[in-house]
Amino acid sequence: VAPVYPARALSRGLEGFVDLSFTVTTAGTVKDPIVLQSTSSLFERAAVRAVLKFKYKPRVVDGVPVEVPGVKTRISFMLED
């Protein structure tokens, strides 16, 4: 799921990234996203919204799906030439 480029960042020609940490649930959805680092606060809300739409295959231990905390990802915001 691609994030929506924030209008203020777009109008200013800003590029950047947001590093996030979150938990993957037993259903493969994302919960509790936390911003670890970002180049601009303008990107944080868009990155959190995008990561909440991510879907994962749940981790299975002994035939039972388990939550996976501490998953990390970087969402990049780059302007096209």
Predicted regions and their residues:
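Short secondary-structure transition/capping segments
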Residues: 29-30, 49
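Flexible loop/coil segments at beta-strand boundaries within sensory signal-transduction domains
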Residues: 25-27
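Short glycine/proline-centered loop/turn elements that form peptide/ligand docking sites
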Residues: 20, 30, 35-44
